């Protein structure tokens, strides 16, 4: 599966009538925050692929557009506080915003992030029972603690994200928030089984979507065999 990840800055070659020529082969778009709704809506309309997003700390509560005011991008799926399965079987979860540094919106304390991370656990456990794994793609705006983050308070990483990576081992953790102005800034780090990637601007990524392991089908197979035997014996 091919993913187009975008974050933080609008790019002319994406907000362009020719975007489908360059990115028409992607299967999914992931937006990691601080992008206007009209930008995400344009990508959806041009590529005709599902877009999943979280909000960044600079997101507007209400955005005016040609179709009138709206509180979310039309046609996109907000991942904040959710653990979901895509129609292709990709398991996604997300948390918005960044560490609180003033009274602005979409900012949370480290303690609040811990609470939100723990709230994802039931959904991730359900994923494990149904799909044989917890999570494929973790989507956040802020970065994990001491991974791609900075020392100033607005750009400090989130400690709870490190825990989510360690325990649930997603294949990808996509984030934004950290602007990349120099070539020597690290934007990709391997943490165990997880590739942590700063999607500032855009990134094209590939994800291998695992199939369900056979043992998850075994209870259904046993039940089906039992029903077939009962039918043969005319007991049902």
For each feature predicted by the language model, list its residue ranges.
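Binuclear metal-dependent phosphoesterase catalytic core
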Residues: 6, 83-88, 164-168, 181-236
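Active-site environment of divalent metal-dependent phosphoester hydrolases
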Residues: 10-14, 35-41, 57-64, 99-104, ...
């Amino acid at each position: 599966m091919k993913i187009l990840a975008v974050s933080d800055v609008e790019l002319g070659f994406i907000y362009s009538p020719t975007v489908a020529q360059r990115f028409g082969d992607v299967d999914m778009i992931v937006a990691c925050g601080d992008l206007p709704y009209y930008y995400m809506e344009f990508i959806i309309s041009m590529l005709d692929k599902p877009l999943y997003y979280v909000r960044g700390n600079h997101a507007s509560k209400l955005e005016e557009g040609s179709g009138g005011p709206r509180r979310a991008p039309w046609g996109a799926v907000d991942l904040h506080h959710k653990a979901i399965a895509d129609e292709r079987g990709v398991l996604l979860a997300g948390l918005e915003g960044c560490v609180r540094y003033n009274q602005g919106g979409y900012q949370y304390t480290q303690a609040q992030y811990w609470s939100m991370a723990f709230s994802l656990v039931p959904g991730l456990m359900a994923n494990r029972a149904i799909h044989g794994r917890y999570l494929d793609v973790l989507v956040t705006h802020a970065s994990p603690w001491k991974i791609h983050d900075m020392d100033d308070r607005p750009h400090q990483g989130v400690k709870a994200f490190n825990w989510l990576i360690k325990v649930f081992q997603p294949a990808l953790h996509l984030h934004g928030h950290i602007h990349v102005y120099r070539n020597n800034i690290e934007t990709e780090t391997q943490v165990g089984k997880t590739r942590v990637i700063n999607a500032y601007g855009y990134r094209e990524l590939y994800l291998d979507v695992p199939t369900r392991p056979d043992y998850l089908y075994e209870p259904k197979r046993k039940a089906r065999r039992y029903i077939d035997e009962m039918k043969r014996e005319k007991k049902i």
